[in-house]
UniProtKB/Swiss-Prot annotation:
This is RNA pyrophosphohydrolase. Residues 6-150 form the Nudix hydrolase domain. Its cofactor is a divalent metal cation. Belongs to the Nudix hydrolase family. RppH subfamily. The keyword Acyltransferase does not apply. Accelerates the degradation of transcripts by removing pyrophosphate from the 5'-end of triphosphorylated RNA, leading to a more labile monophosphorylated state that can stimulate subsequent ribonuclease cleavage. It comes from Aeromonas salmonicida (strain A449). One of its GO terms (biological process) is mRNA catabolic process. PANTHER family: M7GPPPN-MRNA HYDROLASE. Its EC number is 3.6.1.-. It comes from the Bacteria. Keywords: Hydrolase.
Length: 175
């Protein structure tokens, strides 16, 4: 399903842990890494598509995660001309994405597996610092990643703990 402007509706998934790290997945047989993502099928809501893609690509089920946020807007990126399939109809020139921030529930990391539905999209994964993907993703997705991570940062980043040790309740200051 491609809209009138040539963009395919898609969902993007940022999975974080309690330390503010995000799941970064390596595309099958390639050297490129990205967040899980996938198309929205006809008749499907973005949330339904997210859960389907989450299971198909990462092997996680709704009970393994908690939705922390959804992007306010659909975010678009254009494909480089060399990746556009000009012989298809309609022509898809890019993706418009609704993003989801999920927190992996405690003790569920062992459930991550690839290829739960056909050919796997990914063959490796790791936890990376929150902002790492913005610098590392393929260049044509970089602006979308910057925007979504900026929107999700207040919810995903752990709040620093300030230790109070003094009897008067003020913070210790080290010089």
């Amino acid at each position: 399903m491609i809209d009138g402007d040539g963009f395919r509706p898609n969902v993007g998934i940022v999975i974080c842990n309690r330390d503010g790290q995000v799941l970064w997945a390596k595309r099958y047989g390639q050297h490129s890494w990205q967040f899980p993502q996938g198309g929205v099928d006809d008749g499907e809501t973005p949330e339904q598509a997210m859960y389907r893609e989450l299971y198909e690509e990462i092997g996680l089920k709704p009970e393994d995660v908690t939705i922390m946020a959804t992007s306010r807007n659909w975010l678009k990126y254009r494909l480089p001309k060399r990746l556009v399939r000009w012989d298809s109809s309609p022509v898809c020139i890019g993706q418009k994405q609704k993003w989801f921030l999920l927190q992996l529930d405690p003790g569920r990391e062992s459930r991550i597996q690839f290829g739960c539905h056909g050919h796997p999209e990914f063959d490796d994964w790791r936890w990376v610092s929150f902002w790492y993907p913005v610098r590392q993703v393929v260049s044509f997705k970089r602006e979308v990643y910057r925007r979504v991570m900026t929107e999700f940062a207040p919810l995903a980043m752990p709040v620093p703990v300030v230790q109070v040790n003094r009897k008067d309740g003020r913070r210790n200051r080290s010089r």
